[in-house]
Amino acid sequence: METSGARTMTAGTFLVALTLVVLVLLLWHLRWVLLVLFGAVVVAVALDVLIVQVQKRTRLKRPQALAAVLGILLFAGGLLGQLLVPELISQFQQLGRDLPQLFSKVSDLLSSEPRLAQLNEALGEGLNLKGLQPLLGFAGGAANSLIQLFLMALLAILLALDPSSHRRMVVAVTPRPARQQMELLLDECRQALGGWLSGMTLSATSVFLLTWGGLLLLKAPLALLSALVCGLLTFVPTIGPTAATLLPTGLALLQSPQLMVSVLVFRLVLQNLEAFLLTPLLLRKTVNLLPTVALTAQLSLGALLGLPGVLLALPLVVVIQVLMQRVVVQQIMDRWA
């Protein structure tokens, strides 16, 4: 009898392990579908924040409020595009002319320092034709990304149009004893993600405007383009602000080393203000992300999924942190006897 029970337990354990392996492989093969779905959830939460604000100030029902939000966003995007796109196109063209000069100047600076000569040779070898051959598939990748963005936007609109139905579906597939906890968990995830998105949007907008104004005062080249890059990369904490500083600093080097130092000091001051004052102030009511956790998530998802993984790493960490606190810590660890 004991042998039969042991065999049954072994067979059951094997089936559970096999099921988990198959599930992990299935999730890995569907990773891009899951990435698009999670991106749609993030965008839907961002739309929901705006929809709630519109409904508080008007008597519009949700479909009309969603249409109003989309109309406002399209109008604002068109207005900003009309004002900024011509200047951005001009600055992109200027950037294309300046980049060869910048690479040449950096190469000359590296060559003048014996200890950096090997780095210069490595960069030169890395920029040859063989190193650029993988870029030949850029057009196909761009088309695939556009399709994914379109599907993400469509899913986000559908989710924002009727979130309660999708919420009921998630609760319905949850075991009955845990349904109330699932409802609370969904509320907390939505609140945390909405707060993070609102705070980061305000932070990115502030960084864009302050960088644009500061670079204009310093008379740095391509101020609008550099400020736009700095603002967008604010959504990628830890890595983004540091990487964004390279563009205005490098372009300033083409004019003079003094201007480069001025731009670098300005960006460092602004980056520290954003990291230690602005972002904590805007995100004080949402989850507190540790820099080590944020950086690890960005590196891990970036290695697995590329740029989309880096962009969605922080929203995913926000949700996972809520899940860890409410499920793992409170439901498992705190009850461990």
Residue ranges of each PLM-predicted region?
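Anchoring transmembrane alpha helix of integral membrane proteins
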Residues: 1-83, 318, 322-325, 329-337
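Juxtamembrane membrane-interface segments in integral membrane proteins
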Residues: 6, 50-58, 64-71, 79-151, ...
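Alpha-helical transmembrane segments and their immediate interhelical loop/hinge regions
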Residues: 12, 142-253, 257-265
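Membrane-spanning helices that line or support transport/gating and their immediate boundary helices
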Residues: 29, 33-37, 46-53, 57, ...
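Membrane-water interface of transmembrane alpha-helices in multipass transporters/channels
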Residues: 31-39, 217-228, 256-262, 289-294, ...
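Hydrophobic transmembrane alpha-helices
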Residues: 40-44, 75-76, 156, 228-242, ...
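Membrane-interface starts of transmembrane alpha-helices
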Residues: 60-69, 116, 120, 179-182, ...
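Hydrophobic alpha-helical transmembrane segments of membrane transport and translocation systems
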Residues: 260-337
